[in-house]
Amino acid sequence: MSKNFDYSLKDISSNLEKSLKEAELLGEGHNGVVFLLKNNKAIKIFRRMSVWKDESSILKRVRKSRFFPRIYEAKPGYIIREYVDGVRLDKYLRRGNLDEDLCKELYLMILEFERLGFKRIDIRCKDIYIQDDYTLKIIDPKNNYKKRVSFPRHLFKGLFKRDELNRFLNYVAEIDEK
């Protein structure tokens, strides 16, 4: 566990407290810590309430989108959501190339961001998980309805670093012609 473990939850049920004691640590980032609960759901505990408000608000607004995990509970300081398994896009690209199916999913994801009315049409490669069936799930949405970023800058940067940006853009150009 990090030396910076500065989280606290108030007014949690005894069942949730027990579940947390039995949970497996999945990871810790700048904004929170995530555990896998025994019921195969994930709980994210946030450091700052402002980040919790933003992420829980986004996940509630996008609840019908297949690209985001289902949210089960959002109470001050934490979110219980669907566990997202799979391979992070950045790690996937280290092992292999971007294929047409994955290009299509990434393109559909960007179109979904626009459909959802996001002002921030951007996501980091490390926040995109490739599922066994090659669909995508996104974790850690941030500022999607607040900050204006009109193109997927972080995604493009990640694809460029792995020499895959041209392949993706060529696919998009080809599909847009149709």
Model-derived regions, located:
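C-lobe/activation-segment region of protein kinase-like
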Residues: 119, 132-178
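ATP-binding glycine-rich loop module of kinase domains
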Residues: 2-57
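Short hydrophobic-acidic sequence motifs that mark active-site Asp/Glu residues
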Residues: 34-36, 42-44, 68, 80, ...
